[in-house]
Amino acid sequence: MNLFSDIRTLVIGALAQMEQAGELPAGLDTANVTVEPPRDAAHGDMATNAAMVLAKPAGKKPRDIAEALAARLAADPRIASAEVAGPGFLNLRLVSGEWQSVVRAALAEGGDYGRSEMGRGQRINVEFVSANPTGPMHVGHTRGAVFGDALAALLDFSGHEVTREYYINDGGAQVDVLARSAYERYREANGLEPEIREGLYPGDYLIPVGEALKTKYGETLLDKPEEEWLAEVRDFATRAMMDMIREDLALLNVHMDVFSSEKALYGTGRIEAAIERLRQAGLIYEGVLEPPKGKTPEDWEPREQTLFRSTAHGDDVDRPVKKSDGSWTYFAPDIAYHWDKIERGYDALIDVFGADHGGYVKRMTAAVKALSDGRVPLDVKLIQLVRLFKNGEPFKMSKRAGTFVTLRDVVEQAGADVTRFHMLTRKNDAALDFDFARVLEQSKDNPVWYVQYASARVNSVLNKAAGMGVDTTDAALAQADLAQLSHPAELELARKVAEWPRTVEIAARAHEPHRIAFFLYDIASELHSLWNRGNDEPALRFLQEGDPAAMAAKIALARSVGVVISAGLGILGVTPAKEMR
């Protein structure tokens, strides 16, 4: 059940009646008509912009449309009142039974309450993390991993068919650096002094890789020139790093469906095929780019190169795909990789990049648009940095990693659930502060604790009621006399339950899972507020000894909140608390 969607359907139906009666011209586009909570709750339960949206195409004053619409809606038994405000906004109040029906729907639908068919089975590929396989994941990867996984869960919950994908960057120079770094640890494992030259990876995490190389090869690689051991060690070390990355992701309960290799694109004709597709579209040419202003990018050279006419699809400048020496630029395999995803039949692509890849957005979007003839949209979500603190002081680096704080550091300090929730307490493109002490505080200022406390309180109510002999199954509670829920504070909490399906759809359309975390904090706040009022007003307590009808209704309300919190935390990948410790 989606009450906001149901009332919107009611509004659209009333507009259709107005068209039939000649009060509005036929064929008006109602796609932008919305029904949402008003900015000020004192104005009503819901508000619609129908009159404001349709006034111009209808050639009428918005207030005239609003008044005619209000008259039709007020006649519906679900609407208590319909009032025109300002130039033509329409505020609606629903009969209390509508909010009570939401509670019953949440109990009947359980974990599926709020689940939507909005996506209609659309196949979406969400590529995220895609960290270079050169070391353990750092805190920036942590935020990207949580964001991507929660976004995938949100899209799944809203009716999409989702693939979680990791692109292994194993085709560039960085994996050669990894191989040389691992080789030095191999020498160390054989009793020699490692030469960790500048530019190599210094972290202790490569020591086990060196030992594993010794176990496999003994001393046989020590006297060989680099060209004889480089490829073998590179593949061995890359596999070891990917095993480490999989373990790191598992600490956060992130599990990929697909791992795609950049290296696999070379020598298979896939890059050539993707570039040829662009060439046939008239988007590949030979030329010399003007030198860019400011910092010179790595792929610019003052010689003729093979260029992609990305400006034809919204980019600022055309982009090199092949250098003058005949080698591919970094961009070429990325084009081929996205062409591969398009060929696999996805209806939409989402890339989750670090904020330092902001310059890549326009060129990649242009490439996908060109490759798919505009059929497959690409949404690039940029993940801003995470600043780490402990009691307000900057958190120190990990010795194991060499230069950075690892995902493992974060999860070991804070736990997976706390880490996941807190990483979603800001929009992805805003910097996030993560204080190891504060995220574990038991206070309203800590959203993780506050939401989990609400979950635990609901569970406590159910346990105590069961101990009093009340049947607390969802099926039994759904039969309660919900007309007993009549206090404004109770109805306000029911309204929040009603907003859940709408929140899911809005968050899914925007690709913004942080909206789920924000909503959970809001509904937890409403529950805590009602709970605290019960300390002074016994009639508002969830447990009403001596009045089984009232108690069943109030427990049903609490349970409906629990259903929503559990579903929301599930999307975020967080386990709902049954009790606070």
Swiss-Prot record:
CDD domains associated with the record: ArgRS_core
First-listed, main subcellular location of the protein, grouped into a coarse class: cytoplasm
Single GO biological process annotation from the record: arginyl-tRNA aminoacylation
The enzyme's E.C. designation: 6.1.1.19
InterPro entries in alphabetical order: aa-tRNA-synth_I_CS (IPR001412), Arg-tRNA-ligase (IPR001278), Arg-tRNA-synth_N (IPR005148), Arg-tRNA-synth_N_sf (IPR036695), ArgRS_core (IPR035684), DALR_anticod-bd (IPR008909), Rossmann-like_a/b/a_fold (IPR014729), tRNAsynth_Ia_anticodon-bd (IPR009080)
Protein's recorded name: Arginine--tRNA ligase
GO CC annotations on file: cytoplasm
Location of the motif 'HIGH' region: 131-141
Single GO MF annotation: ATP binding
